[in-house]
Amino acid sequence: MTWCNDRSDVQTVERIIPSPGAAESPVASLPVSCHKTCPSCGHNFKFHEQAGIHDLPGLPAGVKFDPTDQEVLEHLEGKVRDDAKKLHPLIDEFIRTIDGENGICYTHPEKLPGVNKDGTVRHFFHRPSKAYTTGTRKRRKVHTDSDVGGETRWHKTGKTRPVLAGGRVRGYKKILVLYTNYGKQKKPEKTNWVMHQYHLGTSEEEKEGELVVSKVFYQTQPRQCGGSVAAAATAKDRPYLHGLGGGGGRHLHYHLHHNNGNGKSNGSGGTAGAGEYYHNIPAIISFNQTGIQNHLVHDSQPFIP
């Protein structure tokens, strides 16, 4: 589903009428505003061509930027291909671009714009760089003010998974976890910082200099295994457990989409939750989970990362 941005939208054109007696000169009629339709809900609203996010009336409390894996790749595709119909006019307000050859992996996540330890997700466009001038190994060492406690670096965990859309591979997703004390006598220490990195194409590895998109967050809730998921749920806020078949195994998703009182989930269209739980995962799956809490926008203010 893409953003409606074609020229067939109904437009309101302002016409300048000259004063009596003045010579009428040709004046280009410029579109002042037009009506656009949201591709998700079908709502029509008045849109000003020259307006920005600060001109919007504000977003209702509870609105969040929580794209699925497929939607993340859709935003990335619109960014790299400069497709006006795929690139949302406000996407740069929600997915910032980190310039520079070192990308995200050079900077500690705490120093990235808008990132903190409350579980909120932040998305970034960036370009991974190589660790060495030769070879294909990516740079994942994080620059810190002091390396007394050992190196800090991102470590890839699990397999690189394909993201499917329409029955075909649109790109790949890899999950990285931040570790400290690399290179010391003791075992490296795992932190709660997590990064999901996405790239387009049919190759498991991104190309050198290729634009990718990553979401970075601090995991605030511990992961649990299999049967302990249901036991951890309280009677008041019991998560929904969905069993998805895949080969001979079972894939469980733990969603924090609590009941809102009328029997419906208060979540949005994407399936987002506070954790992911796997048991005998099939070889190829399509990810839809963020793994943490979602963005929240309060006080009816526009969300600006």
Curated annotation (Swiss-Prot):
PROSITE patterns associated with the record: NAC
Compartment(s) where it occurs, according to its Swiss-Prot or TrEMBL record: Nucleus
Keyword list, A-Z: Activator, DNA-binding, Nucleus, Transcription, Transcription regulation
Tissue: Expressed in protoxylem and elongating interfascicular fiber cells of elongating internodes, developing metaxylem cells and interfascicular fibers of non-elongating internodes and developing secondary xylem of roots.
SUPFAM superfamilies per the UniProt record, alphabetical: NAC domain (SSF101941)
Portion annotated as DNA-binding: 170-225
GO biological process: positive regulation of DNA-templated transcription; regulation of secondary cell wall biogenesis
Domain NAC: 59-219
Cellular compartments per GO CC: nucleus
One of the record's GO molecular function terms: DNA-binding transcription factor activity
Domain of life: Eukaryota
Entries under Pfam families matching the protein: NAM
Role of this protein: Transcriptional activator that plays a regulatory role in the development of secondary cell wall fibers. Involved in the regulation of cellulose and hemicellulose biosynthetic genes as well as of genes involved in lignin polymerization and signaling. Is not a direct target of SND1.
PANTHER family listed in its UniProt record: NAC DOMAIN-CONTAINING PROTEIN 73
Description of its domains: The NAC domain includes a DNA binding domain and a dimerization domain.
Protein name in UniProt: NAC domain-containing protein 73
UniProt organism field: Arabidopsis thaliana (Mouse-ear cress)
Gene assigned in the entry: NAC073
